[in-house]
């Protein structure tokens, strides 16, 4: 009776798992599945019916855990389509498994050694030249639970990877990689992994764990197909297919280079020169900017460089605009030579300005001599008067009024003229104005 009840209930709970169990393997006192030889045909008939029912049933039945039965092999995850994802955020593990997002939502599924839970490796993109079973991503595996206190050098994640993060868009072309990697780095920062991303100097704050490395590795493959990567990225991954951090580090360096290119273009477009600095310094500055752009595969023609330089000239250098306005064949070296010539001329003029002023002041002292004389007395007269000096008429008036004869005939003294004549005779006589005696 007991065996009949077991045979009736077995299709519901165990299914075809009876095919792997024999009466010899299971003792009679431990497992009720042991049946007698007389019931074997009935058991075979029941199992055949169960198998036929399972083939027609679309879904799979849940099998209870039993250590006597053979465990089923894990189902392989189908590769995702490299197109635009319709999801707008990270999902739970159950939904991720159903929607092919499990390869980066649960990085531990990409297990490559004995301490992982699943032996299967999922390769999302057939264009990646990777083996089906890859070696471990790091040389040192995580320590067992009992030995974690003994080894403290193993890097540990400080924060848990954040869920519900907007993923980056899928890379569509090789030319858009520099733009795509910016969104990918932002995606990692929003996932609490910003401290393991290299900065502008190529430095990182901490070492990433194995799980974080697998997470970065899988997300990079999921959103960046191998055949759309630039050549320099392919060369890095061909040497070490999991070295995503090197790709990110060089990408950040290239971003800095692109920023420098933008700064150089802005500096070249806003050039100004008025002679305040030397012409050699100005030429070195412009030549350095042009050479730096040339190293980044950006060639600046002489005509464009001359136009940008002429636009910023002012002062004594401004007239070069009219000179080069009608020129079709502009040479940058010729323009620098003319700027240097004007700068040198202005420098010489500035050095000669003090000596010219001194010579001009010496010529202001005028000498007057009387004609037809051999021995002359020179009267030097300075035309520059001080503020305290008075006109000649005022001086004559003061002398006349201050004389002791001013009370007698003041009007007569004022009307008298003062003159001096110089005679060239032997006695050198000089005639003086006559005065009346009272």
Swiss-Prot record:
Signal peptide: none annotated. GO terms for molecular function: RNA binding. Residues 1-39, 49-60 have a biased composition (Polar residues). Residues 295-397 are annotated as: RNA-binding. The keyword Hydrolase does not apply. Keywords: Cytoplasm, RNA-binding, Transposable element. Residues 1-88, 366-397 are annotated as: Disordered. Residues 369-381 have a biased composition (Low complexity). It is found in: Cytoplasm. The record marks 397-398 as: Cleavage. InterPro entries: TYA. The keyword Nucleotide-binding does not apply. It holds the Pfam family TYA. GO terms for cellular component: cytoplasm. GO terms for biological process: viral translational frameshifting. Capsid protein (CA) is the structural component of the virus-like particle (VLP), forming the shell that encapsulates the retrotransposons dimeric RNA genome. The particles are assembled from trimer-clustered units and there are holes in the capsid shells that allow for the diffusion of macromolecules. CA also has nucleocapsid-like chaperone activity, promoting primer tRNA(i)-Met annealing to the multipartite primer-binding site (PBS), dimerization of Ty2 RNA and initiation of reverse transcription. Retrotransposons are mobile genetic entities that are able to replicate via an RNA intermediate and a reverse transcription step. In contrast to retroviruses, retrotransposons are non-infectious, lack an envelope and remain intracellular. Ty2 retrotransposons belong to the copia elements (pseudoviridae). The C-terminal RNA-binding region of CA is sufficient for all its nucleocapsid-like chaperone activities. Homotrimer. This is Transposon Ty2-OR1 Gag polyprotein.
């Amino acid at each position: 009776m007991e065996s009949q009840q077991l045979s009736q209930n077995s299709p519901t709970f165990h299914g075809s798992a009876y095919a792997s169990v024999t009466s010899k393997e299971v003792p009679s006192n431990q497992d009720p599945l042991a049946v007698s030889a007389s019931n074997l045909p009935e058991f075979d008939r029941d199992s055949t019916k169960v198998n036929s029912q399972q083939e027609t049933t679309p879904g799979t039945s849940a099998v209870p855990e039993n250590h006597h039965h053979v465990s089923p092999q894990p189902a392989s995850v189908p590769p995702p389509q490299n197109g635009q994802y319709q999801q707008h955020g990270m999902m739970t593990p159950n939904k991720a498994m159903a929607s092919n997002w499990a390869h980066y939502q649960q990085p531990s599924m990409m297990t490559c050694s004995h301490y992982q839970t699943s032996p299967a490796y999922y390769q999302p993109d057939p264009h990646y030249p990777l083996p089906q079973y890859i070696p471990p991503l790091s040389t040192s595996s995580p320590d067992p639970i009992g030995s974690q206190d003994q080894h403290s050098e193993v890097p540990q994640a400080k924060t848990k990877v954040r869920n519900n993060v907007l993923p980056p868009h899928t890379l569509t072309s090789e030319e858009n990689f520099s733009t795509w990697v910016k969104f990918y780095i932002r995606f990692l920062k929003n996932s609490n992994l910003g401290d393991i991303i290299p900065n502008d100097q190529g430095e990182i704050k901490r070492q990433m764990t194995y799980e974080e490395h697998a997470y970065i590795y899988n997300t990079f493959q999921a959103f960046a197909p191998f055949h759309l990567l630039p050549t320099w990225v392919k060369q890095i991954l061909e040497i070490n297919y999991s070295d995503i951090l090197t790709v990110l580090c060089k990408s950040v360096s290239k971003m800095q280079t692109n920023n420098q290119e933008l700064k150089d273009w802005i500096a070249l477009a806003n050039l100004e020169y008025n002679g305040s600095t030397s012409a050699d310094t100005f030429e070195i500055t412009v030549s350095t900017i042009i050479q730096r752009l040339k190293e980044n595969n950006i060639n600046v023609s002489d005509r464009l460089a001359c136009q940008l330089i002429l636009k910023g000239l002012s002062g004594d250098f401004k007239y070069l605009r009219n000179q080069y306005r009608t020129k079709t064949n502009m040479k940058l070296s010729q323009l620098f030579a003319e700027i240097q010539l004007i700068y040198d001329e202005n420098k010489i003029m500035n050095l000669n300005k003090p000596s010219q002023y001194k010579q001009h002041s010496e010529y202001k002292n005028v000498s007057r001599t009387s004609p037809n004389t051999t021995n002359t007395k020179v009267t030097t007269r300075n035309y520059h008067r001080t503020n305290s000096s008075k006109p000649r008429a005022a001086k004559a008036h003061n002398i006349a009024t201050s004389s002791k004869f001013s009370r007698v005939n003041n009007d007569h003294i004022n009307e008298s003229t003062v003159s001096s004549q110089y005679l060239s005779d032997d006695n050198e006589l000089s005639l003086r104005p006559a005065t009346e005696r009272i």
